[in-house]
From Swiss-Prot:
This is Renin receptor. The record marks 276-279 as: Cleavage. One of its GO terms (biological process) is regulation of MAPK cascade. GO terms for molecular function: signaling receptor activity.
Length: 350
């Protein structure tokens, strides 16, 4: 029995070891201090609600309170760090919550809401995963971040330029000649370049359309696989990453005038077993729903309403034109009309 309790406690602790942290947030978005766990699949809903968008299912999570509905943040910046359950963040300015059921997630729903509501204003939407060479830029992000390095070769070349982070970061046990170390450092370079490029276009951070940034960093995970989590390289990289994230959060928060939410997700590894696979052994074959009888198109339920409106309005207009034309054609002005008076006067003059 004691062994079972120990196993259950270890499973629960491992399931809640990951963290969801709020690095920066404006006064209009209220995050409460507490130890309330947040499901991994509801993180996009937290981002959507904090920006003032609606979600399909109500979020009964006490960590997010109702803020100022008329003053929403101009940007949401979410950074996902893989390979570590938590980082040594400063406890004073950061609010952290346990993350349960850490399943892979995306902010596509938030991006779609931004596109549908602010399509004419072309907001900045940037989703980037440097280690996978995955990038998604829409709106003004194409012009702002067109010089951003996104492929592994571009990232490597960017690191060896004069103004790269290699010249300012204390590498300690990390090496410039190791591909895994360079991958981690290149992700830090991406963080620096995003804030640097945005600082050249500060007017974009002051418009009325909200912006979205989603970054996924896997360099620390690769370092843990290469050297081990107890290695000096992993510890040095964790400290460097904390400092880089703090600086990145401060820069983005300052560029948006203190009206941005900067969020951090630290996950040891995503639990893909909780995600439904696209193909399973119980998958049924797709049935052909087309009818072989060449039936007519199934119209919308409102078709009869629209048809009757158009029919009777056109009928009324046609009758009005016919009646008006008939009355004008058969109109008798009478002998006292000016037409006849002018005619009689003309006759007398003749």
């Amino acid at each position: 029995m004691a062994v079972l309790v120990v196993l259950l406690s270890s499973l629960v602790s491992s399931a809640l070891a990951n963290e969801f942290s709020i690095l920066r947030s404006p006064g209009s978005v209220v995050f409460r201090n507490g130890n309330w766990p947040i499901p991994g699949d509801r993180i996009p809903d937290v981002a959507a609600l904090s920006m003032g968008f609606s979600v399909k299912e109500d979020l009964s999570w006490p960590g997010l309170a109702v803020g100022n509905l008329f003053h929403r943040p101009r940007a949401t910046i979410m950074v996902t760090v893989k390979g570590v359950d938590k980082l040594a963040l400063p406890t004073g300015s950061v609010i952290s919550y346990p993350l349960e059921n850490a399943v892979p997630f995306s902010l596509d729903s938030v991006a779609n809401s931004i596109h549908s509501l602010f399509s004419e204003e072309t907001p900045v939407v940037l989703q980037l995963a440097p280690s996978e060479e995955r990038v998604y830029m829409v709106g003004k992000a194409n012009s702002v971040f067109e010089d951003l390095s996104v492929t592994l070769r571009q990232l490597r070349n960017r690191l060896f330029q004069e103004n790269s982070v290699l010249n300012s970061l204390p590498l300690n046990s990390l090496s410039r000649n190791n591909e895994v170390d360079l991958l981690f450092l290149s992700e830090l370079q991406v963080l620096h370049d995003i804030s640097s490029l945005l600082s050249r276009h500060k007017h974009l951070a002051k418009d009325h359309s909200p912006d979205l940034y989603s970054l996924e960093l896997a360099g620390l995970d690769e370092l843990g696989k290469r050297y081990g989590e107890d290695s000096e390289q992993f510890r040095d990289a964790s400290r460097i990453l904390v400092d880089a994230l703090q600086k990145f959060a401060d820069d983005m928060y300052s560029l948006y005038g203190g009206n941005a939410v900067v969020e951090l997700v630290t996950v040891k590894s995503f639990d893909t077993s909780l995600v439904r696979k696209s193909r399973t052994i119980l998958e049924t074959k797709q049935e052909n729903t087309q009818s072989p009888y060449n039936l007519a198109y199934k119209y919308n339920l409102e078709y009869s309403v629209v048809f009757n409106l158009v029919l009777w309005i056109m009928t009324g207009l046609a009758l009005a034109v016919i009646i008006t034309s008939y009355n004008i054609w058969n109109m008798d002005p009478g002998y006292d009309s000016i037409i006849y008076r002018m005619t009689n006067q003309k006759i007398r003059m003749d």
